[in-house]
């Protein structure tokens, strides 16, 4: 193209004085030649280029017509001046077009093509060509046609590349800033991606920033779909037999269903317990037909083996499911969750905790519960009480059924309730722990505990004075309060004998639950506690107490039998009334919450070293948490897989130690080479080996910390205190102060539950 231009230029200079018509013919030939070349390129380009071609042709026609009229006018001098100006513009345009062609070529090499922009031809041609030395490369002038230019279409493949890069970076969790900021401004996709997380944040209901409802009002609008009932019983296949006294016996559907509950637990320890077997057989017979009752009279003659094997095979089959089958089940569960797992409360979508009704089965209980083995009957719609607002759509019961009752009580937080048949207790469907109602309750609980901090010294002085009271009732109350404060004991509720497991709290302690030691293990005035607490978890502790407490306990135990109450003049009602007099809202649980939270805060201050790395700080946190769990007696049985997991962890530690030893040998060898060689390459090798050793040392330390943590916590339940007794703002403040990621302490569910604390607390927060 550039050669043709030079040839044309020289031709114009040589024939400058020739006839006007000849000049125009040459000029048009040149123009047509260029136009043909552009036409070839444009066949590959998009519709926009075609549009430019049509504009080009139109401009040529206009030019010809204008030429004719101007020649007819005969104003040749004026005409010549104009052509001088036009020729200048033409030369500039040709230069720009030549550079544009080179640019297009380069862009094609880079993986995308940009259609050449053909400008409209000038209205007239000139005859004067300026000297070559005056011609300078210029930027492409912007004219009206450029306003139609759309860079978004040209950079289509750029956008695709950028999208792909962004996706790859998001997968790695490292979203980098784009190198070319101008491109980002033109391309809308990345901007949309950046805005998505912000939208998610906006959707989170920051209820703690809103004005609270009047006392007692829990909500103003509540709508939900009701509960999901347990699926109906599916009879066993004919190939699965039940035997009684060695003979096959076909059971009625109701009797068979209850028999399957026992068969599923056949290998469990429960089915060997006499009380479990007795309660089960009694309730099973209630579901039998008269004929079955006459035949089945002894549980020991019943053979549930085939039933048990059938359910084991089903469990194994579920484990062996294909990915497609598992995905199908997951999708069905998600569909169910989407429909029934959420409610609308005060124009906000809130998650429901337990929207499924518990299926029928056998009651287990904790410890040696007197009712273990009894039949938990199937809950029907006729047992259900629905709670929603008056202006909400009442959920529809299953076809052929109706609800027991529909209420509109906005002073309670439950959505659905029913009464279970074992102990006659009321069961509820409630909102998820991350909901506003649950969050407000937690916040209020910790604020009450903080109020106790202001008057706890006064209360302690008061009960110390009461140890010397002339009234036995006051002395017993003061000693009980001392135990609740110092040992974080629960108050203990009064229970009907034979109805529940024999668990006790502070007020219900019996003489048999404590032993007094004037001196034990080098300590004076030691009280030895041994009783079953909540959930039949054993509380065993040896505690040195103040002398006056010890003397009072000796007095309380005088002339009493082991089964007699230690605090015979005290009950939970009397104690709670006294606590309310000391501070509004004060209960034994508030004392537990206060002591747990204050212990965590003190332990974190003592155990956290500023120069420790993150894993060491997390170990310090878990040790502080464990101190609280021990105080609150949050125990657990060691996991069944504990020994195996510890062996696996130890083998990892041993392997890491070997790797570290090898790395240290390599470093030593590299240092020796560096002393001899004394060049830059060997120095780099030494630095590389040093970094490898440091990395392995860190990895080994993490594994050792993990092993220590597991061993120390194998019988301690850290989660109970973390979720229920520790003010989360203490943890959040500690994380922010020491740069520990909150994800290392709280999992996703816990972060949702404590969103209010994470948003509210800063590093200077004090309980």
Curated annotation (Swiss-Prot):
Phylogenetic lineage: Eukaryota, Metazoa, Chordata, Craniata, Vertebrata
Ranges annotated as biased composition (Basic and acidic residues): 1-23, 40-110, 131-168, 181-201
Domain of life: Eukaryota
UniProt-annotated stretches for the region Disordered: 1-201
Protein name stated in the entry: DNA topoisomerase 1
Cross-linked residues, Glycyl lysine isopeptide (Lys-Gly) (interchain with G-Cter in SUMO1): 119
Catalytic reaction equation(s): ATP-independent breakage of single-stranded DNA, followed by passage and rejoining
Every Topo IB-type catalytic domain range: 434-767
Enzyme class per UniProt: isomerase
A Pfam family of this chain: Topo_C_assoc
Its biological purpose: Releases the supercoiling and torsional tension of DNA introduced during the DNA replication and transcription by transiently cleaving and rejoining one strand of the DNA duplex. Introduces a single-strand break via transesterification at a target site in duplex DNA. The scissile phosphodiester is attacked by the catalytic tyrosine of the enzyme, resulting in the formation of a DNA-(3'-phosphotyrosyl)-enzyme intermediate and the expulsion of a 5'-OH DNA strand. The free DNA strand then rotates around the intact phosphodiester bond on the opposing strand, thus removing DNA supercoils.
Organism, as annotated: Chlorocebus aethiops
Ranges of Basic residues composition bias in the record: 24-39
Entry's family note: Belongs to the type IB topoisomerase family.
Record: active site: 725 (o-(3'-phospho-dna)-tyrosine intermediate)
């Amino acid at each position: 193209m550039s050669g043709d231009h030079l040839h044309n230029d020289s031709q114009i200079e040589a024939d400058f004085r020739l006839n006007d018509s000849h000049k125009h013919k040459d000029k048009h030939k040149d123009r047509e030649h260029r136009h043909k070349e552009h036409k070839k390129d444009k066949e590959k380009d998009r519709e926009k280029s075609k549009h430019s071609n049509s504009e080009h042709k139109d401009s040529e026609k206009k030019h010809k017509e204008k030429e004719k009229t101007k020649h007819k006018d005969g104003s040749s001098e004026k005409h010549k001046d104009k052509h001088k100006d036009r020729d200048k513009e033409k030369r500039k345009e040709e230069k720009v077009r030549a550079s544009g062609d080179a640019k297009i070529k380069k862009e094609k090499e880079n993986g995308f093509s940009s259609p050449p922009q053909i400008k409209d031809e000038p209205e007239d041609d000139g005859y004067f060509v300026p000297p070559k030395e005056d011609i300078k490369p210029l930027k492409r002038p912007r004219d009206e046609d450029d306003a139609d230019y759309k860079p978004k279409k040209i950079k289509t493949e750029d956008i695709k590349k950028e999208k792909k890069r962004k996706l790859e970076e998001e997968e790695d969790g490292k979203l980098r800033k784009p190198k070319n900021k101008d491109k980002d401004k033109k391309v809308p996709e990345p901007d949309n991606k950046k805005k998505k997380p912000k939208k998610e944040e906006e959707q989170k209901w920051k209820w703690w920033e809103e004005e609270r409802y009047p006392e007692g009002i829990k909500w103003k609008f509540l709508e939900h779909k009701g509960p999901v009932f347990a699926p109906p019983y599916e009879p066993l296949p004919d190939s699965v037999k039940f035997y009684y006294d060695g003979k096959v016996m076909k059971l009625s559907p109701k009797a068979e269903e209850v028999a399957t509950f026992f068969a599923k637990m056949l290998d469990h320890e429960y089915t060997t317990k006499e009380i479990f077997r007795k309660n089960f057989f009694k309730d099973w017979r209630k579901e039998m037909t008269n004929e079955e009752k006459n035949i089945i009279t002894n549980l020991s003659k019943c053979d549930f083996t085939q039933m048990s094997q059938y359910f084991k095979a089903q469990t194994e089959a579920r484990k062996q499911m294909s990915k497609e089958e598992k995905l199908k089940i997951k999708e069905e569960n998600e569909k169910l969750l989407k429909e029934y797992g959420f409610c609308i409360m005060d124009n906000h979508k809130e998650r429901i905790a337990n929207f499924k009704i518990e299926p029928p089965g056998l009651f287990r209980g904790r410890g040696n519960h007197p009712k273990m083995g009894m039949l938990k009957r199937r809950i029907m719609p006729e047992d259900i009480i629905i709670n929603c607002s008056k202006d909400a759509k009442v959920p529809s019961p299953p076809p052929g059924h109706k609800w027991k009752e529909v209420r509109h009580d906005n002073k309670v937080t439950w959505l659905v309730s029913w009464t279970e048949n074992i102990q006659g207790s009321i069961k509820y469907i409630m909102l998820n722990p991350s909901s506003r109602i649950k969050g407000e309750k937690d916040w209020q609980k910790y604020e009450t505990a903080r109020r106790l901090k202001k008057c706890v010294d006064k209360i302690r002085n008061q009960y110390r004075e009461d140890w010397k009271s002339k009234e036995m009732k006051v002395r017993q109350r003061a000693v009980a309060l001392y135990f609740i404060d110092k040992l974080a004991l629960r108050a203990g509720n009064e229970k009907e004998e034979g109805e529940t497991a024999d668990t006790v709290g502070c007020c219900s302690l019996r003489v048999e639950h404590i032993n007094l030691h004037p001196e034990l293990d080098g300590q004076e005035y030691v009280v030895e506690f041994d009783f079953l607490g909540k959930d039949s978890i054993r509380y065993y502790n040896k505690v040195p107490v103040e002398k006056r407490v010890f003397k009072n306990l000796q007095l309380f135990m005088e002339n009493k039998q082991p089964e007699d109450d230690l605090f015979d003049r005290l009950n939970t009602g009397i104690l709670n009334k006294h606590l309310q007099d000391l501070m509004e809202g004060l209960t034994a649980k508030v004392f537990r919450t206060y002591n747990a939270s204050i212990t965590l805060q003190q332990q974190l201050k003592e155990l956290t070293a500023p120069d420790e790395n993150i894993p060491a700080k997390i170990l310090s946190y878990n040790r502080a948490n464990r101190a609280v769990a021990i105080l609150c007696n949050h125990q657990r049985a060691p996991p069944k897989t504990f020994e195996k997991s510890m062996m696996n962890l130890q083998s990892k530690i041993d392997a890491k130690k070997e790797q570290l030893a090898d790395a240290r040998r390599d470093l030593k060898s590299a240092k020796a080479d560096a002393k001899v060689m004394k060049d830059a390459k060997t120095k780099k090798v030494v630095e590389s080996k040093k970094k490898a050793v440091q990395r392995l040392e860190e990895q080994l330390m993490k594994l050792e910390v993990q092993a220590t943590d597991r061993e120390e916590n194998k019988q301690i339940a850290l989660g109970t205190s973390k979720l229920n007794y520790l003010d989360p703002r203490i943890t959040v403040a500690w994380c922010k102060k020491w740069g520990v990621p909150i994800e290392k302490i709280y999992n996703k569910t816990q972060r949702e539950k404590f969103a209010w604390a994470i948003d509210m607390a800063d590093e200077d927060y004090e309980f």
